[in-house]
Amino acid sequence: MRLGVNFGYQDWGANLQGALAMAKEADSLGYSSGWTAEAYGTDAVTPLTWMLANTERMSFGPAIMQMPARTPAMTAMTAATLDLMSGGRFLLGQIGRAHV
């Protein structure tokens, strides 16, 4: 069984160090993945990039990315770049769309 941590959508300015401490602890305990979310205000990719840079084994990805906020090409380039830079630890999760 694989376990993951959902960091959700939060105020990263106020809680970045707490979330990073949780990510490091989960990494040391053998958790397999960490997930962030986004809404208008802060994005999902930037915090997980910080977590990828500060952990060793866990994979990280955005559980939800708002497609109206970025093009499919930019999403693919972001995913490919982070996957290369993290040694294959980037996960591309659910890609949501706005309600019509």
Feature map (PLM): residue ranges:
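A short, GP-enriched loop/loop-strand-helix hinge that lies immediately N-terminal to
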Residues: 59-65, 91
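Positions that flank functional sites
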Residues: 41, 66-67
